[in-house]
Amino acid sequence: MLKTIKIILLSIWNVWFYVLAFIGILTTFPLLILFSSSERFYPQFYWVARNIWSNIILFGMGFWPVVENKKKLEKGKSYMVVANHKSMIDVMLMVYCCKHPIVFVGKKELDKIPVFGYFYSKVCILVDRGNPKSRKDVYSKSIKRLEKGVSICIFPEGGVPEPGVVLREFKNGAFNLAIQFQIPIVPLS
């Protein structure tokens, strides 16, 4: 009985998340279209995502995030932002916490979600985790963004761990890029 109630509540939570995500996209649609049209507008796209879209989702889901131990990041400098990944809300939290634009490396499958997938594929670096060539492409696309002074956010576990797993083994990509470009790694949790 308890398991059934948990499944029902989690399903309601997931549906509510997607409703809020859709409301966020709908209310900012003209800006998202304009700012996703070119990489040079990415800082403006990120501003909309950070100050409107993520707030609609976070506050609508009942989250009131508090940023502790806040460090000033140097404007115009690239960073490798890494965090563990527990749920869909993690992306909103990363955007909320990082004032300076970050570009996410994310799984390609999400580009199939109607409307959201369009913007996701325009502004994120997508990886098809089962395709070695795609992983190499992520590396070259990340280099391109880092050379422009944009920071990259990677969840080094490579996805959300199974229930009961606290932390999976990290993949090397984020750390290899940080070493190659001699950029600081900023851990968020």
Label each PLM-derived region with a short phrase.
Residues G60-S189:
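Soluble catalytic domains of membrane acyltransferases
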